[in-house]
Every structure is written in structure tokens, then in C-alpha cells.
């Protein structure tokens, strides 16, 4: 099918022209969406609502589920129609490897019809229950306080329809919405009751009580029982705001932790409290108290406020920027907002601690840190994965690896390491590939192949132990199942891995879709490698790969010159997180390797000189920090541990 025909197909299911064209730029997504359209039997076109759900399925994390076609079919048959049903369907894909129609129908609300009468009754019941609150707050009542209970009682209803009927009920109950009553002068035609409300709203200005003790300025991490019954001042963001009539519960966040705060009395007067929106920055002054034993608060304390002021306003439209119904692409378009969430911010803190733990490990073991260049004129791993840039009229590249530079530092510093960005023009669209990643690399002189494996093993275990000691609650809040891996790690030769795959039905897929056994010399792709790793269920050093499969600089095995002293460290759930090898130390052997790889020896003179002036047996490795975190935190996708991911399809924000 031509590109023009593909575009017509995508337009026929309701995609707008821009989204259709953007999809066509991604060959993998194009093929996937076409398959899903065929599975849904809507190749001749369909309603836009169906097409949007099919597109969301093509871009969701569970798209490669073996039972996905059943969801495609259900969408095409309009059994899955609402966003909440679609979310349930993708959760079903995540939780199940085999499909059962009855279980699926129950789980996703297939066939459940919520009538307008049922929606209206639920809204009427809610208004009866919240009559006093609605009467007092009127249009200032947070819409979430009404919508969230309705989401629970009307689980399978169309949320848009619920919102429309809820708005009508509010207008019937309260009259037309007065939008500017607090900030602008009331027009001459405004009714007297509205004028009275405005006068009340403008009547209060908060001031600190000068008779109270001067507050101590604290970061949230410092707020602990140590300062119980003391007056403190905290500057933070409003992480959550829960308004309950005459009292407001506020969860504060300043990057160092979370703190619960309680506001009451004049502090929650309608003239000021409506400005306290989620993500607003505030100054809160009050007394730290230890809550009752049955009340859990972060840090073991609660802030009873006696004064607050707005430092930086937020906006009510934040709730529409991202929410539970946002698809993955939209969430990562709004990554700068998404990272403020509890889980995402916890991952960013762990990422920071992880870098500290790696450096701590290296310095404790007498490694020195190196800061190599990332603009280079040679390559290390392979020319096809290079990003080329114009360097004053000459071609230059973004570095794939700093290994060659680290090797030149061996006679200068001995054991050395770097934590530097690396770049790979990866075309793979998988859950573990990035085009820019944080690359931890180390080079070590005077070691053996076995000692190299021991050092990598020690690094991984030691860093896990350090991280867990630093903040076990933080680690377990993200991955409750985390356990430090035990040494020694399993060692498996590449040849044994091929045999394992044969014996356990792990096969390679040919271009025509047929599956056959792996043979010696085959590269084991990510999916099959991960399947083997997950079956074994523990860390594995995959060792001694054939020379033809590895980079030019890797040393040959003395017992079999067709093999290399190479290794990949595989971790369950992720696969490879470390790649390493012993390096060629002989001058003549390295020159021969250049020629075999088609490299210009003159461009590598500075690297070759390491074998000319005092060579020695040495080895090193590279660890992908994001892959390490993905494994450690048991994340579904590597993008979740990136600050801002860079992949084949994403360069913003």
C-alpha cells in the first residue's frame, strides 16, 4: 500500500490530517496501526471515536500483548466505547497472557449500559448529600469534589455526558455562573446579592500575629518531631489541596519531601482560599505538631498554619493539562508537569541518589573521574549509529562511547570512570532503547577477564546496597518488591545460551514470520534474550561472544581465538544493562583489527599509541544508567526514568 493510500486509510478512521501525516513518518507505528485497523475490521472507515481508540491502542504500552487483537476487535465492534473502558482493556492486556471473553467483558464493562436517567439520579443523590457544601461554596466548589464520586458510582458511564449533565444541574441549582465576582467591579446590572458577596470577599487581608514567636525557616526534610510545638516557616508548592467546608488540608512539596498542612478560620476565607490552587507556590507559617497515632503524616508531623501567603499563582486549567485519561504521548508532551507527580518525582530523586552512589562506589575503590569530550571525529561502536554534526565545515560526531578516551587515561590515573551522555542513532522502537542516554563507563589496568566480571558484579550490588541504605522508604515506594541481588551472578557462555534457547523453545523470527532455532553466530534479539533471562530469573553474565559479533577493540579468548573475552550483564525484566570486555593490548593485533573493520589507522593514532608506549592487559565496561534504574525500580518503560527522554520519535520538550 502506498503512502497516499495509508494516509487515506488513517483519515477514514477519523484521524486529522496532521496526526495522519505524523504517523506516516514512523514506519513502525504505521505498520502497527494498519494491523490494528485490520484486526478491528474497519479498513473501510469508521467513526472518529473508534479511530481515536484504535490509535490509542497502537501507542499504548501493552500494544505488543499476544491477545491485543481481541481488544482491537472489541473497539471495532463498539463494545469498548469509553475512555474508562479502554483503560480497563489495556490493564487487562497487562495482567493477562490468555484471553477469556467472559472475564474480559466483566473487567471492561462490556454490555453495561448507563442510561441518562441513571446518571441524573446519581447526580441528584450527590447534590442531596452535599447540599450544605454546595449552598455555602456555590460556584467555588472544586469540580473534582463532585465529579470524583460520580466516577465511582457511574464507573462505565461516558464521562463527557456525566460532565454535561453535572454542569446543567449546577446551573439549575445555583443560577448562571458568576465568573468575575471577586476581581472586577460589579456591573450596574448585577443583582444586590452578588454585590453583597463581593463586599464580603474583598473584606479580609491576612496579617501575621506579631505577638507569636518568630518562625524558624525550614526545608520540608527538616520538619520532624525534633521541632514539635515550634513555630516554623515553609516555602513550597501546593501538591494537593483538599477543601472541606471550613478547613483545608494541604499537602506541600518543596523537592526535599512532603508535609501535610491544615488551614482553618480566616485562612480559608473565600476571598483568598480560591487562589490556593494545586501547584501554586506558597509561604506557610504555623506550628509543627505530632498527629495522633492513628493518623499517618509524612515525616511524622503536621503543620497547623496560622498564616499563609501566595508567592506564585497557579491556574485552574492544570486539571485539564494531564489527567488519568491522558494517553502516553500527551503525558510526555507535558513531561515538565508530569514530573511533579508523587511517583515521577520519587523516581527523579532516586536517579539523583543513584548517581551519587555510583560515584561513592568508585571513589571508595580509588577510581578517578574523567570528563571526556562528547564531540569526536572517530567512532567506537559502529558507524551506522552515529549522529553527524557540522564542525566548522568538517564532519564530527556525537560520541557513542567514551571508552577510547578512558583507555588513554590508564597510564595517567589508573582505574578511572566517567558518567557522561552518549548518543546512538537507534532506530529501534522498544521499551529499553534511547538515542541519548547517561553512560557510566570504567577502564581498569592490570586485571583479568574474571576480575573484570567480579568488579562489575561488585559495582551493581554495592550501589544497590548504598541506595537502599540512603532511603529505603523512597525505594520501596516505587518498587515494593526491590531486593539487593546476591553474588555471585550466574555465568553463561554465548554458546550455552544458544543451546538454552533451543531446549526451551525460544526461537528467532525470520522476515516471513516463521520461527526457527537459533544457530551459533546468530545475534539473540532483545525479546528472546529477555525471555531467556526472565525464565532463569536472576542476573546473568553472558560471556565469550564470537569475534564477528563484537567491536574491533575486544580481546580474543586465549583458548579459542574465534571468541572474545566479552560479556553482557542481563537483568530480569530489562535484559542487558552492562556491556564489557577485555581490550586488545597488542600493537600489531590492534592495527590488524583496524584494517579488518575498515578504519583509518591515522585517525586513531592517539589510541594506538597506548599499545606503543607501555601496553598492558586491561578491560572495561559501560553501564546504561537508565537501564539500571529501569531494572531496579521495575519500571515498564525506560522513558519513565529519564528526565526528558530522547528516542527516534521524540526530541521535545
Swiss-Prot record:
E.C. number(s) listed in UniProt: 6.1.1.22
PROSITE patterns named among the record's database cross-references: AA_TRNA_LIGASE_II
Entry's Gene Ontology cellular component terms: cytoplasm; phagocytic vesicle
Gene3D superfamilies linked to this entry: 1.10.10.2420, Bira Bifunctional Protein, Domain 2, Glutaminyl-tRNA synthetase, non-specific RNA binding region part 1, domain 1, Nucleic acid-binding proteins
Localization terms from the record: Cytoplasm
Enzyme kind, highest EC tier: ligase
GO MF, one annotated term: ATP binding
GO biological process per UniProt: asparaginyl-tRNA aminoacylation
Catalytic activity of the protein: tRNA(Asn) + L-asparagine + ATP = L-asparaginyl-tRNA(Asn) + AMP + diphosphate + H(+)
Top-rank taxon, per record: Eukaryota
Sorted UniProt keywords: Aminoacyl-tRNA synthetase, ATP-binding, Cytoplasm, Ligase, Nucleotide-binding, Protein biosynthesis
Keyword Electron transport appears in the UniProt entry: no
Membership in a protein family: Belongs to the class-II aminoacyl-tRNA synthetase family.
PANTHER family reported for this sequence: ASPARAGINE--TRNA LIGASE, CYTOPLASMIC (PTHR22594:SF16), ASPARTYL/LYSYL-TRNA SYNTHETASE (PTHR22594)
Protein's name in the database: Asparagine--tRNA ligase, cytoplasmic
The species this protein was found in: Dictyostelium discoideum
Lineage: Eukaryota, Amoebozoa, Evosea, Eumycetozoa, Dictyostelia
